[in-house]
Amino acid sequence: PYIPGMEAPEFNYLSPSRRKTRAVRNIGGEHLPVVIADRMDGKTEVNPQFTPDYIYAGRTLPEQREEGVEYILDADVWEGEAGTWPAFNHAQLPLMGECSAELKFLFMPYMAQTDEVIACLKVHPEVVVISQSNHPNRLGEHRALLHQLMTEGLENPVVFFQHYAEDEAEDLLIKSAVDMGALIFDGLCDGIFLFNQGSLSHAVVDATAFGILQAGRTRTSKTEYISCPGCGRTLYDLEKTIARIKAATSHLKGLKIGIMGCIVNGPG
């Protein structure tokens, strides 16, 4: 289906820079992109290496919360608990003005971006937009929403919500990387929210989100390995060697390790 939309005048596809946004707490501005994780099933465990910045708990705040993680609740059940923030949908705009939270989230599909929504965002710079799309071309809709915000002169940060139903980690990785890659390279991403209804664990989904941001060179969370694929000029077992290197160095966050196997182009 056709996606109505126009490119923002200030956007340059040939040399994109990060979209100018007004920081709301640790989201937007000069901050690194955040990761929002789903825990609507009540589970709270996280991998210390890939701890999300925010956990969306839906309608029920868990009794035991992860230290250092803030929680997002639906606005109609949010009661102002410390370390929690409300999330509105576009039908709840009238309630937003009555809420005193210094950080608010707004779930918004592109086609719901009415004049009323634009007017609301102009008077509520504390709102972080969570862009949603069920369109076959979800990248196109996410882009259209961002370009509309830029055209209107709005500087609200935007987090991209991506919905999947995958049972294999590689399938989730490939699909979510494709969906998010262009948005990151265009400088439009202030955060990522992967929601998976398949059988994958939360730890896998969280690690995928952080991995995408690292691959996009926007946030580092683990050791990075750059290896040649191996060919007839490789005189040793490259895969086993890589596994040994990873086992010894995977805790060295921020380090980039190059692995060469070629007797012609590298020492091996």
What is the role of each PLM region?
Residues 141-146, 150-167, 218-266:
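Small-residue-enriched alpha-helical segments and adjacent helix-cap loops
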Residues 1-4, 65-71, 198-218:
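C-terminal helical cap(s) of enzyme catalytic domains, especially alpha/beta-barrels
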Residues 133-142, 166-174, 199-204, 236:
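Active-site glycine- and acidic-residue-rich loops that bind
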Residues 1, 128-129, 187-202:
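Glycine-rich phosphate-binding active-site loops on the catalytic face of alpha/beta enzymes
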Residues 44-46, 116-120, 140-144, 167-184, ...:
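Catalytic cores of alpha/beta
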Residues 2-140:
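Active-site beta->alpha loop and helix N-cap motifs at the rims of alpha/beta catalytic domains
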Residues 114-121, 142-147, 180, 206, ...:
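Generic structural signal for well-ordered alpha-helices
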Residues 10-32, 45, 202-220, 230-243, ...:
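Glycine- and Gly-Pro-enriched alpha-helical subdomains that act as flexible
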